Amino acid sequence: MLETLSRQWIVSHRMEMWLLILVAYMFQRNVNSVHMPTKAVDPEAFMNISEIIQHQGYPCEEYEVATEDGYILSVNRIPRGLVQPKKTGSRPVVLLQHGLVGGASNWISNLPNNSLGFILADAGFDVWMGNSRGNAWSRKHKTLSIDQDEFWAFSYDEMARFDLPAVINFILQKTGQEKIYYVGYSQGTTMGFIAFSTMPELAQKIKMYFALAPIATVKHAKSPGTKFLLLPDMMIKGLFGKKEFLYQTRFLRQLVIYLCGQVILDQICSNIMLLLGGFNTNNMNMSRASVYAAHTLAGTSVQNILHWSQAVNSGELRAFDWGSETKNLEKCNQPTPVRYRVRDMTVPTAMWTGGQDWLSNPEDVKMLLSEVTNLIYHKNIPEWAHVDFIWGLDAPHRMYNEIIHLMQQEETNLSQGRCEAVL
């Protein structure tokens, strides 16, 4: 019994153990050499999402949304901006959905004039930000505990099938609106492609879909992370267990903040954060590095990582393969995983892609573009890597302003009975 518990503890704390060894080494260097200069740590590194919003002077609300299968999701809202805060009447609603191992903080990690969440609020929109099941802010269930394997038996399939409908319907009920705008980043776009192509009744509730660094397939992705995903399932489970993946415990967060606060480690810290998606370091506000690092790893399930492993190996956008015909029949009514058809999605879609993006690779994007039947706009930014879409210093004038223009044009068209926004 003790041996089993010891093994479980080692598996669940493996990452903290390695980082502790690294910190011990750094402390030894401090003792034996000149003290390493440190940077002032941004207080937002220690805040939750609502606290960050309030710290920047914006109003915020936080809700819990229950899904059909019992998960309880945290949803953050910026109901209005600091520009024209007394404007009365309903505002157009936008839902922002983060990427893999991310959270709602993806949209507010930069200063207000550089964060899409704040920029949209100041442009007159009612901004909602989702948190997918299993991340740092959505770790509740009506009947299951995070200590149970069953809690972690999900992937982006369930996020698309259950999380998105629950959040979208909650927002519509709360605001009294009939439709919303949907902005997805990375895995947030994957959720959108699946949900809007398989649930036409949900797709009818979307005015326009904005896909940033879109991912449907990862056949050509050249990120080091996708090479790791080529490992057999059993090896991935052996490394990370069967429950959560890359969740920042309080200890781990403090450790990451400390490491990224060392001037000598500045470049290393940024390189680690950019390793999976490609490098464009000159486009990041490195004074915010501690905020990025503290909020980047919000976690997901190991099963979600296994689903991405299947996607890398198959080169297709398919449902999770449960490993047997019997289990697949139980979960998706056929013996083999369902292949999702993006071409069945009719929502007006605008896409922004990066030429140096290692995850949303140009070759995969090329295949995706041929599948999107109602593409109203596509822009490729040659220098951009994966995180430029949420952290890029030039994101406001190269992309965010275009998103707002398309939304405002759509609002004008709707008020005048016209059909399509044009950039």
Curated annotation (Swiss-Prot):
Lineage per the UniProt record: Eukaryota, Metazoa, Chordata, Craniata, Vertebrata
InterPro entries associated with the record: AB_hydrolase_1, AB_hydrolase_fold, Lipase_euk
CC annotations in GO: extracellular region
GO molecular function terms listed in the Swiss-Prot or TrEMBL record: lipoprotein lipase activity
Protein name: Lipase member M
Domain AB hydrolase-1, first and last residues per copy: 92-392
Signal peptide (UniProt feature, chain positions): 1-33
A Pfam family annotated for this UniProt entry: Abhydrolase_1
Source organism per UniProt: Homo sapiens
Any Gene Ontology biological process: cornification
Glycan-linked positions: N48
Tissues and organs where the protein is expressed, per its UniProt entry: Exclusively expressed in the epidermis within the granular keratinocytes.
Alphabetized UniProt keyword annotations: Disulfide bond, Glycoprotein, Hydrolase, Lipid degradation, Lipid metabolism, Secreted, Signal
Localization per Swiss-Prot or TrEMBL: Secreted
